[in-house]
Structures are given as structure tokens and as C-alpha cells.
Amino acid sequence: MMAFWKIFFKHHNIFSSNLNNQLVNQDAADKILLVKYLEGRGTIVNVYLSFNSYVNLHDLEKLCDSVGWVRRPLKKVKIAIDNSFVTASLFYEQNKKKFLIGFARATSDTSFNATIWDVVIHPDFQGQGLGKMLMAQIIKQLRYEDINTITLFADPQVVNFYKHLGFITDPDGVKGMFWYPL
């Protein structure tokens, strides 16, 4: 597993944001300027990062709809978020209203392992480094908590995105196994 971290940190320079040398206090992180003057939706916006676990579920559902994800029951989504170890949101503000443009969360045993879930960036804002910055902040929080094994599940079309961040398929060749009710 140490080989993974050597590869991961070899690629650390892809994470460029004004938070690179700071660790964010999750409890106090309601609104942190992440990117100034980003172009999106035909306008220039400031993008903010929040580690506040409160997320408007309808806004999150719209964000997930924008990338074609299957809808999930909002009650279960709320439970999943409430039971997450780390949540992070990206948004911009316009006319005193927040617009959710990115989200990710991680679950953990709080000791050894964490899994990153639900990484999503609105299509109007993809390709500008926001996904990389969001992942960098989630990983930074997990590493601060001394989590050594970070996993995620990725659809085939985004595997290369995660590979560019230093994630690798299991070096031991172990395949994940799943159980679903029939």
C-alpha cells in the first residue's frame, strides 16, 4: 500500500489552490474562497468550498441530475450525508443565493480506511480543475485524520480522471466484491 502513496504524492503538484498549505477546520468551514474569477455559465464567479455537512438536498439532486445520475430517495441521501466522515461542497453566490456546483463525501472507520463517494461537478464547471481541488481537499482532511487507505468507486468513463490524481487499481489484483438483495 505504501507504493500507492508514493505514486499519489508524486502527483501532488496537480493540486493547486489557495488552500494547499492550510488544513481546514471542518466545523468552522462554512465558506472558504477556493477560486477567484472562474468562468462558468457564461459569467465570472468566485467558487467557495464548504465542509459544512448541511447540503440542500434538492440542490444536490439537481446537481446529480445535471450529470445523469439515477435519482436516489432524498431521505436515504440525507442519512448517507449525516453518516459521512467528511463532506465537501463547491458553490458560487449570485444575488445572495447559493448555487451548488460540486460535491463529494467520504465515509470512514475513523482509524484506517475511508471511501470517497458521490464526487460530482456540474458540467458547466467541468474541465477547470474543480474536481481535482475538491478531491485534494477531501484527501487532505482524511490524511490529517491519519487515514492511510483511501478507496473510491469510479464509473469507467472517469477512471482516467482518478488515475491522474494518483489513484491506482488495486496493486494486489484484488477485485471488489458486492452483495445486492435479489
Swiss-Prot record:
GO terms for cellular component: chloroplast. Its EC number is 2.3.1.-. Gene3D superfamilies: 3.40.630.30. Pfam families: Acetyltransf_1. It is found in: Plastid, Chloroplast. Keywords: Acyltransferase, Chloroplast, Plastid, Transferase. SUPFAM superfamilies: Acyl-CoA N-acyltransferases (Nat) (SSF55729). InterPro entries: Acyl_CoA_acyltransferase, GNAT_dom, NSI-like. It comes from the Eukaryota. GO terms for molecular function: N-acetyltransferase activity. Residues 55-182 form the N-acetyltransferase domain. Belongs to the acetyltransferase family. Ycf52 subfamily. This is Uncharacterized N-acetyltransferase ycf52. It comes from Gracilaria tenuistipitata var. liui (Red alga).
